[in-house]
């Protein structure tokens, strides 16, 4: 542990978009991304949800892994399980994130700062960046910055097949 008792962790998550007509809602960074009223039927597929055992919120899931890694408390799979019968099945990522913060506290850690980079072509995160930062910061109890980038049409995110996120978090021993 560092001299100041500050530890750093990194997390990553990726999910494919659900097939059109699946009925999955799109949740990213604790926010629901509805299909805009002005959206054409052809463009509505951009707002199809994300496949996953939970809501597939890659930002929340990457942040969970970063926080757990910093405190050396495992990862999202070791805490919530995987598959349809897992403790995290059907849950919102933001709720899981709040549970992780409580788990950190019960083990003597508190989040100090975090950042999440969302990687994908859709939806356009910048239009709701402030909301995303507010939602994640409220859940974690510390400042969380949110950035977004595309991959210039490279890889599965560039082809529009899915979305990913990388997160870094600082936690302090209390």
Swiss-Prot record:
Belongs to the IspF family. GO terms for molecular function: 2-C-methyl-D-erythritol 2,4-cyclodiphosphate synthase activity; metal ion binding. Pfam families: YgbB. Involved in the biosynthesis of isopentenyl diphosphate (IPP) and dimethylallyl diphosphate (DMAPP), two major building blocks of isoprenoid compounds. Catalyzes the conversion of 4-diphosphocytidyl-2-C-methyl-D-erythritol 2-phosphate (CDP-ME2P) to 2-C-methyl-D-erythritol 2,4-cyclodiphosphate (ME-CPP) with a corresponding release of cytidine 5-monophosphate (CMP). It is an enzyme of class 4 (lyase). Pathway: Isoprenoid biosynthesis; isopentenyl diphosphate biosynthesis via DXP pathway; isopentenyl diphosphate from 1-deoxy-D-xylulose 5-phosphate: step 4/6. Binds 1 divalent metal cation per subunit. The record marks 53, 150 as: Transition state stabilizer. This is 2-C-methyl-D-erythritol 2,4-cyclodiphosphate synthase. Its cofactor is a divalent metal cation. The lineage of its organism: Bacteria, Bacillati, Actinomycetota, Actinomycetes, Bifidobacteriales. It catalyses: 4-CDP-2-C-methyl-D-erythritol 2-phosphate = 2-C-methyl-D-erythritol 2,4-cyclic diphosphate + CMP. It comes from Bifidobacterium longum subsp. infantis (strain ATCC 15697 / DSM 20088 / JCM 1222 / NCTC 11817 / S12). One of its GO terms (biological process) is isopentenyl diphosphate biosynthetic process, methylerythritol 4-phosphate pathway. The keyword Electron transport does not apply. Keywords: Isoprene biosynthesis, Lyase, Metal-binding. Homotrimer. Its EC number is 4.6.1.12. 4-CDP-2-C-methyl-D-erythritol 2-phosphate binds at residues 13-15, 75-77, 149-152, 156, 159. A divalent metal cation binds at residues 13, 15, 61.
């Amino acid at each position: 542990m560092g001299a100041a008792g500050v530890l750093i962790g990194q997390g990553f998550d990726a999910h494919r978009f659900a097939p059109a007509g699946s009925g999955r809602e799109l949740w990213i960074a604790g926010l629901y991304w509805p299909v805009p009223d002005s959206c054409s039927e052809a463009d509505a597929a951009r707002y199809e949800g994300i496949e996953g055992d939970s809501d597939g919120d890659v930002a929340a899931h990457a942040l969970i892994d970063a926080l757990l890694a910093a405190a050396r408390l495992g990862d999202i799979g070791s805490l919530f399980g995987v598959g349809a019968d897992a403790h995290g099945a059907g849950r919102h990522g933001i709720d899981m994130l709040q549970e992780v913060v409580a788990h950190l506290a019960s083990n003597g850690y508190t989040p100090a700062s975090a950042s999440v980079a969302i990687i994908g072509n859709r939806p356009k995160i910048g239009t709701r960046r402030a909301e995303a930062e507010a939602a994640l910061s409220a859940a974690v109890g510390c400042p969380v910055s949110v950035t977004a980038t595309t991959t210039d049409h490279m890889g599965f995110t560039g082809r529009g097949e899915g979305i990913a996120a990388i997160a870094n978090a600082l936690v302090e021993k209390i």
